[in-house]
């Protein structure tokens, strides 16, 4: 199990002798003398779990590891693998977010037929993502066609900058700037347009939300959603039936595109959502649901009812290589200032009856964190 610590536990030991050490012998820098394209090809074949260490070798390595060229090379070689990150957020400081990546011990998983609290440790952990990786995760990414948009400043200060990376030609360019500076904004794509909301001052009523049209390369401000939404804590944004839904800690809202107006959403949006193989899943009312597009209704994921009795708090869900990954927290004791973050991996299968069945592969405590920090959301992609 990993531990969330904000202080380094590395201590230097004093030298036992005053004898000066001989100067280190210069080592041949054969690897660093290679052309960048050769280095990128080599790095693309290495597991991303080593990137954090390699980024400390030199500034050149760090820039290459964080570059879009490396991402393109991994896509070309087919070495990208699914990954999922979970965010822990301070309730008193909304922008104090700590990112952790799920590290899974490589071995063959067998679905659990029965399990109790005293499950054998699986060796899976949530590992902290140090700077600059955690900052990169907080930069908003959204894909429209073959283009990936980056919204927000690299140094995590509010910014109007928008960068576009075209996977087809492998080049990056700067897009027209937003109308207001943002950081940690929420985005979604609907009908080929990019919607951006929040991430700015709550009193920014004119441009709290705006939409970008890639065809005309223009930004347009959306109507003011009102004080109640602007001053609430936005949880996520999702699209459904040609509408944009915003879930907050107070109420749920919907933006009606054709009418150009905001309304309070009466329907249940789910507390956490993700998409797996073109099927939308959500966690709501202590249950896991999937959306049947043909019947236009939410249906229960079957086979995972035992998981419902295992925790009392809300959970966050994500997509890990086609499997449903679930995170929740569990208090160890009322007397302690820490709590456990638990994780479950669920494989999914559609039965002959048209229902989706889940099979719990494993679950375990993967992190010990300060009790004051709350699970915010998951982010999943190929890395």
Curated annotation (Swiss-Prot):
InterPro entries: F-box-like_dom_sf, F-box/kelch-repeat_ARATH, F-box_dom, Kelch-typ_b-propeller, Kelch_1. It comes from the Eukaryota. SMART domains: FBOX, Kelch. Kelch repeats lie at residues 147-192, 193-239, 272-318. Residues 1-27 are annotated as: Disordered. The keyword Repeat applies. Residues 28-79 form the F-box domain. Keywords: Kelch repeat, Repeat. One of its GO terms (biological process) is seed germination. Involved in seed germination. This is F-box/kelch-repeat protein At4g19330.
